[in-house]
Swiss-Prot record:
One of its GO terms (cellular component) is endoplasmic reticulum membrane. Induction: P450 can be induced to high levels in liver and other tissues by various foreign compounds, including drugs, pesticides, and carcinogens. This is Cytochrome P450 2C39. Liver. Its EC number is 1.14.14.1. It catalyses: an organic molecule + reduced [NADPH--hemoprotein reductase] + O2 = an alcohol + oxidized [NADPH--hemoprotein reductase] + H2O + H(+); (5Z,8Z,11Z,14Z)-eicosatetraenoate + reduced [NADPH--hemoprotein reductase] + O2 = 11,12-epoxy-(5Z,8Z,14Z)-eicosatrienoate + oxidized [NADPH--hemoprotein reductase] + H2O + H(+); (5Z,8Z,11Z,14Z)-eicosatetraenoate + reduced [NADPH--hemoprotein reductase] + O2 = 14,15-epoxy-(5Z,8Z,11Z)-eicosatrienoate + oxidized [NADPH--hemoprotein reductase] + H2O + H(+). Belongs to the cytochrome P450 family.
């Protein structure tokens, strides 16, 4: 048999196998566009704007439909009612983490974000308990964030009102809060280890959100057999893991079980106390992976939201003026903002909520998977099926938020100017997998933004109407375009 004949037979076999799997897999799944062999619906999706593609499909197939990403079926939920019904009303059945091949290669089933089953339940329970022990929701954590907010102000003063890219400085602040929780201590913004950690984390988020990584996740064979930026991610992860394991080793050598200092100490104590079954879940590798998850989730999401916020505040100076007027009235110029102030600052609270709604940071959520065969709206979704929930369709629902494509804090204010909650506000996801650090993120956004606006004016290098809001990258998360700002003392 010559090579050409062999290749033709191999390709034909793959196509037939793909067609057979798709026909068998369709079963009672929701409707959707007809997939091509092997590549599925990949060519019908705009990988630079997946959210819009999902919206277009929903118009044709309804709020629950099926796409084939490669040869694997993925059920998509579009609109508040479908998303709520799955994540909240059927939270347990939709509580597994869906497949992201590149992330699976990085985490190997470990950590708090991408693990499943008993391992995920154990590590999530431990993490939430430990964060509470370390002061989450209490004055202790608030003190740390306030301290970091003042350090942030000092760094911003050093720019002396000159044009600067705020990316690095705005990343340092939330990263240092996580450092204080994980390692007990914060880092100086010039510390070499800190700078390297920041660089690796930021680079990985950009690459993981790129169109190329979406291609790799749809066709996992590319990860092992093709060159590309994904190899840089793996190299960075290896560096971060090595750094974290060294920090863990230092903690092991100085551990006092009667006086835990930070997250690592609590974990090491838990490891010593764990029974035979739990010991498998509380390995040092799982600790390193969990810390990496906390850094990635706790640093990049908050810092990116802050970057978007400054960009929006420059584009809408009337909003900035109202926020600063409220800051001056409630807080003044001579004391640090605190969380109690938020109850008396409805416009500022509404502005921060509107930033999160408008930017739609994680457009399609992190994929879920069903834990068992489930009948959902007369469709049968088999156990293990990946489920994508469109947060864009919830946060930009015109029935809940009139003119959703406009930035308007009024979306979260009632007729009397009081803050108005919305069940559609899901930037942290919802249900069993809601972000474990939601409380910390809300605190950081309020304290960092109010402290910045208390001390500085924001000046754009271009006219406000010319400020570009189109995301630089719009994959796993939406990253804002690069910009410069003049941060001028008030």
């Amino acid at each position: 048999m010559d090579l050409v004949t062999f290749l033709v037979l191999t390709l034909s076999s793959l196509i037939l196998l793909s067609l057979w799997r798709q026909s068998c897999g369709r079963g009672s799944l929701p409707p959707g566009p007809t997939p091509f062999p092997i590549i599925g619906n990949f060519l019908q999706i705009d990988i630079k704007n997946v959210s819009q593609s999902l919206t277009n499909f929903s118009k044709a197939y309804g709020p629950v439909f099926t796409l084939y990403l490669g040869s694997r079926p993925t059920v998509v939920l579009h609109g508040y009612e479908a998303v709520k019904e799955a994540l909240i009303d059927h939270g347990e059945e939709f509580s597994d983490r869906g497949s992201i091949p590149m992330v699976e290669k990085i985490n190997n089933g470990l950590g708090i974000v991408f693990s499943n089953g008993n391992r995920w339940k154990e590590i999530r329970r431990f993490t939430l308990t430990t964060l509470r022990n370390l002061g989450m929701g209490k004055r202790n954590i608030e003190d740390r964030v306030q301290e970091e907010a003042q350090c942030l102000v000092e760094e911003l003063r050093k720019t002396k009102g000159s044009p600067c890219d705020p990316t690095f400085i705005l990343s340092c602040a939330p990263c240092n809060v996580i450092c204080s929780i994980i390692f007990q201590d914060r880092f100086d913004y010039k510390d070499k280890d800190f700078l390297m950690l920041m660089e690796k984390l930021n680079e990985n988020v950009k690459i993981l959100s790129s169109p190329w990584l979406q291609v790799c996740n749809n066709f996992p064979l590319l990860i092992d057999y093709c060159p590309g930026s994904h190899h840089k991610v793996l190299k960075n992860v290896k560096y971060i893991r090595s750094y974290l394991l060294e920090k863990i080793k230092e903690h092991q050598e100085s551990l006092d079980v009667t006086n835990p200092r930070d997250f690592i100490d609590y974990y090491l104590i838990k490891q010593k106390q764990a029974n035979h079954i739990q010991q498998a879940e509380f390995s040092l590798e799982n600790l390193a992976c969990t810390i990496n998850n906390l850094f990635a989730a706790g640093t990049e999401t908050t810092s990116t939201t802050l970057r978007y916020a400054l960009l929006l505040l420059m584009k809408y100076p009337d909003v900035t003026a109202k926020v600063q007027e409220e800051i001056d009235h409630v807080i003044g110029r001579h004391r640090s903002p605190c969380m109690q102030d938020r109850n008396h600052m409805p416009y500022t609270d509404a502005m921060i909520h509107e930033v999160q709604r408008f930017i739609n940071l994680v457009p399609n959520n992190i994929p879920r998977a069903v834990t068992c065969d489930i009948k959902f709206r007369n469709y049968l979704i088999p156990k293990g099926t990946t489920v994508v929930t469109s947060l864009t369709s919830v946060l930009h629902d015109s029935k809940e938020f009139p003119n959703p494509e406009l930035f308007d804090p009024g979306h979260f204010l009632d007729a009397n100017g009081n803050f108005k909650k919305s069940d559609h506000f899901m930037p942290f996801s919802a249900g069993k997998r809601v972000c474990a650090g939601e409380g910390l993120a809300r605190m950081e956004l309020f304290l960092f933004l109010t402290t910045i606006l208390q001390n500085f004016k924001l000046k754009s290098l271009v006219h406000p109407k010319d400020i570009d809001m189109i995301p630089f990258v719009n994959g796993l998360i939406a990253l804002p375009p690069h910009y410069q700002v003049c941060i001028i003392p008030r």
